[in-house]
Amino acid sequence: MRARTIKRIINQSHTDAYDLMLETWQALDKDFAQVIGDAMHDDECPATMELADFFDEYAEVAYPLASNIKCFVRTAHAVLENPNDSDFNKIVALTDICIELGQDLDGVFLDGLNMLKPYAQQYDLSSIANAIRDIREFILVMNDGFAKTRDGINAVRGGE
């Protein structure tokens, strides 16, 4: 699983982990969009309107999350080149934003799964559930990594 690889690398505090995190997020997002799109275009699927609403809610959180992850990665690389307090402040703020968006996305998934539950008897939603499970696992690992990064920066800046 990609999320487990990220967790291992983030725990090693290596900046390549941030690049891998971004690549993994982009792949998971693409996979999720494909799974939802396939279901929406399946004539057998009774929940196409619900899936469209679900994907719209997903996009409202997922795209800002992707943007903030990209900004975090750029800033993390900049800090390696030339560490300064301004970039440290930006990284801490971005970790907080990404953690919050990750939690929001988890809420969107829970709502979406509840919305789709009535259709589970009529239609095989396992591919959607699996894609959601992969992203939720990634979010847990990502948020843990961001929290460790934030706490590490704050500890260093606080003289710990």
Protein language model annotation of sequence segments:
Residues 1-160:
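Sequence/structural signature of long amphipathic alpha-helices
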